[in-house]
């Protein structure tokens, strides 16, 4: 059977099914509402029947959410590969952050610098990670983020420091300023209030703090009892997300209280969760280094595997405002960009590259697009 014809039949069947549910529920509501508004009891309807109906409706609603999500999201839709700007002489990219203007910030294993790229992957700026002074010393940033005021902040695990880059310096090219000491800083992010978030890997903690204009730390707070926290990111509804090595991914609210773990809420078994982020719609996305996957955890419905192939060692993870998913693939020494929605959800989105475009070569249709 022709695939297009078969797909049309499936679409018609799905639409008829959903429409039948809508019509039946509307009809039942119209008949039941005036009867239930009179306080004369429930007729012959038993408590058990109400419970059964409630459970069935709950299941149907969950199934409809899953259908909606599966229609809305794509899997393994790789549209671009950005080579590691540090070249093959360094380790693969590990930390990644995408700013509101679409700029991409990248750190790599064993590379003493932060690369700032355009959304197309072209290098815009290079920030060498060097402490200027009598004896200039390079350091290796583990992860990177951008503060609300636009300053680049990194975690320096080797020197147990958090550093912020300041353009207002006595040095013509700016300088890195140490703003705090952490036992083993690994991941770094910014919460909804503008505070910097840092994971303390060996201590099992996440520290949050604000900075004043003189780079003085204010309003410190610590979340403890985590198991090897790796990456941290702004979460949905103003909270934050943190991944635990060989463990789970946990969501905290803006009062630093645990809301839930993804493993418990969704019944999902992680291998080695690494990069985490939330998209503009409030969905949570998690890279799994061991399983070489990326999963999306929707607000309602079951988890969806967005990337199930083509990753060697996914570490850092971020979403762009244009609705693209960027994965730092340390094992493949590049950044991989996926289009995970069926169509742009916002009119302000930048044009997306379509793998179905007739202008693409066969190599590009498979998802590999050299820059």
Annotate each PLM feature:
Residues 1-82, 90, 97, 211-212, ...:
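Protein-protein interaction scaffold domains that mediate dimerization/oligomerization
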Residues 106-130:
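Beta-propeller domains
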Residues 314-371:
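Blade-level signature of beta-propeller repeat domains, shared across WD40, Kelch, NHL, RCC1
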Residues 78-87, 123-135, 171-179, 215-223, ...:
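A short beta-strand motif characteristic of beta-propeller blades
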Residues 118-122, 166-170, 210-214, 253-257, ...:
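Short loop/turn segments that connect beta-strands within beta-propeller blades
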Residues 106-110, 146-147, 154-158, 196-203, ...:
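Conserved beta-strand positions in repeat-built beta-propeller and related beta-rich domains
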Residues 87-99, 133-147, 180-195, 224-239, ...:
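Beta-rich, blade/repeat-based domains predominating
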Residues 112-115, 160-162, 204-206, 248-250, ...:
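Structural signal for beta-propeller blades
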